[in-house]
């Protein structure tokens, strides 16, 4: 299964949201990225963007490229250096949020999923970019290096490139296991990702919601047999 979402509690104590699960075991995922400000970065995606760009740019460079005030960049830089109020995540949603902020579509989330939805809404045709993986980890830092290097190109093409990169990369890793692939999670409402997965023969949600509703349904289905035999709980 390819599971792409905004936030989920990982078995390692970190925040998951871009995972490949095979026979109940995590076999692959998106690159871990630092999230300065933890939950506040969900509301202000430029914080997430800073965390990613900080892998290959200085605070001064980030300020110019991302449109973040120099003083705020200094604070975020210190925060990351001291690991103060920072978390680590493999979330697909946070990647989409950061890309949406970089491309100028959304700098503040005023409702659930807004940055990612605007990224999708402003997407046209993806550009060609090489997938970068390492030990079943889809690297997202090179994706943002590409975006920065090509920032003057059509923003709608760059937006589509982000979503296509994640879809192709996650499918490539999952396909190694020679098993039927299921694509689900909150990001399985994303048209670009769904169309790619379906074109590759992956199964997607039809009768059960892909997001929180499907999660609740799955929990109920898992617990129902145990309710009949409380000794198993």
PLM-predicted stretches and their roles:
Residues 1-233:
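Acidic, glycine-enriched active-site microenvironments
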């Amino acid at each position: 299964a390819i599971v792409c979402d905004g936030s989920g509690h990982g078995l390692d104590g970190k925040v998951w949201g871009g995972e490949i699960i095979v026979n109940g075991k995590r076999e692959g995922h998106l690159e871990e990225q630092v999230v300065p400000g933890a939950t506040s970065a969900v509301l202000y995606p430029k914080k997430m963007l800073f965390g990613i760009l900080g892998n290959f740019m200085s605070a001064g460079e980030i300020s110019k490229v991302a449109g973040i005030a120099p003083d705020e960049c200094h604070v975020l830089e210190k925060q990351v250096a001291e690991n103060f109020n920072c978390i680590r995540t493999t979330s697909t949603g946070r990647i989409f949020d950061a890309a949406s902020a970089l491309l100028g579509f959304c700098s503040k989330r005023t409702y659930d999923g807004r940055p990612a939805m605007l990224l999708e809404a402003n997407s046209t045709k993806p550009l060609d970019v090489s997938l970068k993986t390492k030990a079943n980890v889809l690297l997202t830092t090179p994706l943002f290096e590409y975006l920065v290097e090509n920032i003057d190109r059509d923003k709608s093409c760059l937006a589509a490139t982000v979503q296509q990169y994640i879809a192709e990369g996650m499918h490539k890793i999952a396909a190694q296991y020679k098993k039927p692939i299921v694509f689900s999670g909150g990001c399985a409402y994303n048209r670009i990702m769904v169309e790619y997965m379906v074109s590759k023969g992956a199964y997607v949600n039809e009768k059960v919601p892909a997001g929180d509703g499907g999660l609740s349904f799955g929990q109920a289905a898992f617990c129902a047999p145990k309710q009949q035999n409380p000794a198993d709980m």
